[in-house]
Amino acid sequence: MSKNNAVEFRHVSFTYPDTEKPVLNDINFKIRSGSWTALIGHNGSGKSTISKLTNGLLLPDADANSKIIVSGITLNSKTVWNVREKVGIVFQNPDNQFVGATVGDDVAFGLENRGVPRNEMIRIVNRVLSDVGMLDYINAEPANLSGGQKQRVAIAGILAVEPDIIILDESTSMLDPNGRNQILKIIRQLMIDKNLTIISITHDIDEASLADDVIVLNDGKILAQSGPIDIFSKPELLQEIGLDIPFVEKVILKLKETGIKVPQSIKTQDELEQYLCQLNSKK
């Protein structure tokens, strides 16, 4: 595996017990280190199965040609714990991840399991809570937090154990638009500051448009893998499998039809509005 790849799947299939049809069927892909990759597809397409395979929560169907490589480690029954140290998952419902009586206790849980000395543990907990803007809540009870605050704490708990890869498994789907945008901004900044690899499992097409790369799944196979501009410039491809294109991409396509070219660097609605205002002011 190239040093530039954080995750690589080679000829990976997976079939759940008591079912005949594989949920993943001979898939191959690579995810670049330090990048943000979004996995999109309808329910049952295999997105969450990929996240569990990447973390070693599941092992692929037995096949001599099948291989999963994570942070340079080939995943198997002997290396699964090494792989899990490299990958952290933030799930859809943060309540299912909380184990501590306070925010600080919860973030410290993974460090306690690794035998980190108390003074070092306190330093790490304070640092990661500061990273996600939750240090003021260190003594708060998780049950009293908002959904967005709970997800920030869940992210801090993952950051504390310093993984190479963070998987967001539908982790913004239960948040309101403001909470979702705040979480995505935090993740993007952490990715840059700490050179993390982010894998986003999402139904939210607008969230996927913010990624560096997009993998489109359909019925256990990879339909396409490319940058978001390329993927979302083919609306018919997504519509065939019941997906839409992001609102911003819809507007950009309409502008293109009228002869207005929008820079490829523009991904968000705010950036598009700012560009159009600048364009209008030049007239």
Curated annotation (Swiss-Prot):
Positions of ATP binding: 41-48
The answer to whether UniProt assigns keyword Transport to this entry is: yes
Domain ABC transporter spans what residues? 7-244
Q: Which GO terms describe its molecular function?
A: ATP binding; ATP hydrolysis activity; ATPase-coupled transmembrane transporter activity
- Enzyme class, broadest EC rank: translocase
Q: Which GO terms describe its cellular component?
A: ATP-binding cassette (ABC) transporter complex
- Subcellular localization(s) per the UniProt record: Cell membrane
Membrane topology type = Peripheral membrane protein
EC number per UniProt: 7.-.-.-
> Which cysteines form disulfides?
none
What are the protein's UniProt keywords?
A: ATP-binding, Cell membrane, Membrane, Nucleotide-binding, Translocase, Transport
Name the major location: membrane
Q: How does it assemble?
A: Forms a stable energy-coupling factor (ECF) transporter complex composed of 2 membrane-embedded substrate-binding proteins (S component), 2 ATP-binding proteins (A component) and 2 transmembrane proteins (T component).
Q: Which NCBIfam families match?
A: ECF_ATPase_1 (TIGR04520), PRK13648.1 (NF010167)
Entry function: ATP-binding (A) component of a common energy-coupling factor (ECF) ABC-transporter complex. Unlike classic ABC transporters this ECF transporter provides the energy necessary to transport a number of different substrates.
This protein's name: Energy-coupling factor transporter ATP-binding protein EcfA1
- The coding gene here is ecfA1
